Structure formats: structure tokens, C-alpha cells
């Protein structure tokens, strides 16, 4: 019996040293910038609070926030908009205290209402999202929300998994809201879910400024049911190369047609994913943690996704 116990302990210690866990900067959710935005009088003139996962700071003025400073890879769905001089703040991602101490990130799916001049009600559906890249403020139009997002950050590693703590509240109802703000919100068939994914991409830019990409690694998970107790140290495996032939592959794990990045000319352009290759060295990493799986303005208000302690796992 003693020999068996010793062997088990040896195996446990060997496994511990067979891998290493590297924190992603600010991924412990303990540092936040708080922004206070005073909305235009036309919208009621209230002061709204926006949060950024960033060095601890407080900003008491309207204006764009410049993501990507101080080695910070994170951006959020929280945004400051200035449309022909009308200023508005929208925030569905925020810090929240954990029951056993520390701080986590809470992401809500919300129908955000705007009352113009006290008469016209406008509602838009906004999921809370945390991602690697930049949100390019100010937002000047709602026609194409992706034109203000620079997806991904430079990265050359080859991790085996994305690791994080999570819990979620997911409605079982089989309908979602479509609410773009131009008309009354409509119900349509669907089931909204929280989502986590990581892409490792090899990118390059051609002479015309187009950004091309080969998918090197993929990790993807949708959370279809509520998990109201914390799951600590959840691991999302990263699979290298072409995953389309795997039994667990789903179409949504494939190439994203709407994601964009800023090219060397300072222009936001589509990221043209063109193939799979496990042998290439990654140049960029895209991590997305979001309370809703649908495109902009579609989802189930009331869903919530909490995350904490976001790390990368490597083999030694």
C-alpha cells in the first residue's frame, strides 16, 4: 500500500511540473479603470459609469479611452459614443466581488433604453464582452459595430489551453430579442448562450493593406445551461491545425467573417481567414469571453456570464 501511495505522489508531482501556467496581464480581474461619462442633455444628462479592465484609475471626463496601454491586452463592450455631438455611454461589463474574496468580471446581456427628449424610446440589445484587442472610441454610428473593433493582440506562444474560473445564468427559453434601436424590439427563434473562445492566427498584410490570416490554433466553448456555482480552473483545450474533420467540430468554430483589425495604414479592415496550418508560428491571439453568442443587437436579456483568473497553460 505504501508503494502505491508513493507512486501516486510521484505521478502527481510529475504532472505538476509537466506544465506551466502563465497569467494573462490583468486577467486576475483585480485592477479596473472607472470612467464617469455625462450624457448629453438631449438624452437626460445623467452620469453613467463605464469600467475597463486596466490599471487602477478614475477618469472624470467625457472622451475616448485608449485601449492597449501599459501592456494591457484587454478591451470590452463598454463604450463611449459621440454621434454628431450627442454623447452616450453604454456599459454591460463590470467588476463584482466574489463570495470568497477578490474581484471577478460580470458580463450581462441587457436591453439598454434611451429616451430622446423625454419622448422617443430606443432600445438596443447589448451583451457584455471581454476580448483581446481594442475598442476604437468614440463610437459614431450603430450601423456597423464591428468597424470600431481591432480584434486580437500580437502573440507568438503555443499554449495548450485557456484556463479560467466561471459561472453563468443562461435562460432555457428558445427565443431571443432582435433590438437594433431603429424599431421596437422583436422576438425571434433562438437560444442565447455564453461563449468563450481563443484563436491563434498567423497574419500578414499585402501591398493594398488587406490583412490575411491562417488559423493556427482554436479553442471554443458555448455554455448552454446555467452553472450557478463557480467552476474554478476550467480548461478550454487549444487544438492546432484543421479541426473541421473532428467529431466535435461545429460551424461556428470556423472562420469569422466580421472580425477586423487595424492595418499599417491605420485603417480598419476585415481579417481574411484563408486556411489552417498547425506548423506556422502565431502572430496574434484573439480571446473572446462574452455573455451572448449572437451577432450585435441579438440575444436574451437576463443572461449573465462571470469570469475570473484568466491564464494560459503551456507544456514544459
Regions found by a protein language model. Give the residues of each.
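Bacterial Sec-dependent N-terminal signal peptides
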Residues: 1-23
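A short secondary-structure junction signal
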Residues: 174-179, 208-211
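Generic recognition of cysteine residues
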Residues: 7, 11, 104-105, 168
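Aromatic (Trp/Tyr/Phe) and Gly/Pro-enriched flexible surface segments
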Residues: 19-159, 163, 189-241, 250-316
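Extended, low-complexity, turn-rich repeat/linker tracts enriched in Gly/Pro/Ser/Thr and Asp/Glu
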Residues: 168-175, 186-191
Amino acid at each position: 500500500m505504501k508503494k502505491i501511495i508513493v507512486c501516486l505522489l510521484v505521478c502527481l508531482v510529475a504532472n505538476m511540473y509537466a506544465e506551466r501556467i502563465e497569467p494573462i496581464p490583468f486577467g486576475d480581474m483585480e485592477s479596473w479603470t472607472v470612467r464617469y461619462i455625462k450624457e448629453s442633455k438631449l438624452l437626460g444628462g445623467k452620469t453613467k459609469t463605464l469600467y475597463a479592465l486596466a490599471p487602477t484609475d478614475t477618469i472624470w471626463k467625457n472622451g475616448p479611452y485608449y485601449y492597449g496601454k501599459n501592456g494591457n491586452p484587454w478591451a470590452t463592450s463598454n463604450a463611449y459614443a459621440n454621434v454628431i455631438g450627442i454623447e452616450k455611454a453604454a456599459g454591460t461589463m463590470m467588476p463584482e466581488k466574489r463570495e470568497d474574496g477578490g474581484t471577478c468580471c460580470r458580463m450581462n446581456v441587457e436591453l439598454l433604453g434611451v429616451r430622446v427628449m423625454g419622448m422617443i424610446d430606443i432600445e438596443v440589445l447589448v451583451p457584455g464582452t471581454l476580448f483581446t484587442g481594442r475598442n476604437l472610441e468614440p463610437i459614431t454610428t450603430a450601423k456597423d459595430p464591428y468597424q470600431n473593433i481591432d480584434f486580437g493582440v500580437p502573440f507568438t506562444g503555443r499554449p495548450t489551453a485557456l484556463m479560467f474560473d466561471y459561472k453563468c445564468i443562461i435562460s432555457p427559453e428558445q427565443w431571443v430579442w432582435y433590438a437594433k434601436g431603429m424599431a421596437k424590439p422583436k422576438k425571434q427563434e433562438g437560444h442565447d448562450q455564453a461563449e468563450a473562445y481563443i484563436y491563434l492566427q498567423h497574419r500578414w498584410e499585402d501591398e493594398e493593406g488587406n490583412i490575411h490570416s491562417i488559423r493556427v490554433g482554436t479553442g471554443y466553448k458555448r455554455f448552454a445551461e446555467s452553472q450557478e456555482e463557480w467552476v474554478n480552473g476550467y480548461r478550454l483545450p487549444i487544438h492546432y491545425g484543421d479541426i473541421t474533420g473532428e467529431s466535435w467540430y461545429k460551424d461556428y468554430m470556423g472562420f469569422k467573417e466580421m472580425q477586423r483589425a487595424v492595418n499599417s495604414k491605420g485603417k480598419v479592415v476585415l481579417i481574411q481567414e484563408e486556411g489552417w496550418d498547425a506548423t506556422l508560428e502565431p502572430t496574434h491571439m484573439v480571446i473572446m469571453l462574452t455573455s451572448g453568442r449572437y451577432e450585435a443587437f441579438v440575444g436574451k436579456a437576463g443572461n449573465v456570464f462571470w469570469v475570473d483568473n484568466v491564464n494560459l497553460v503551456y507544456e514544459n
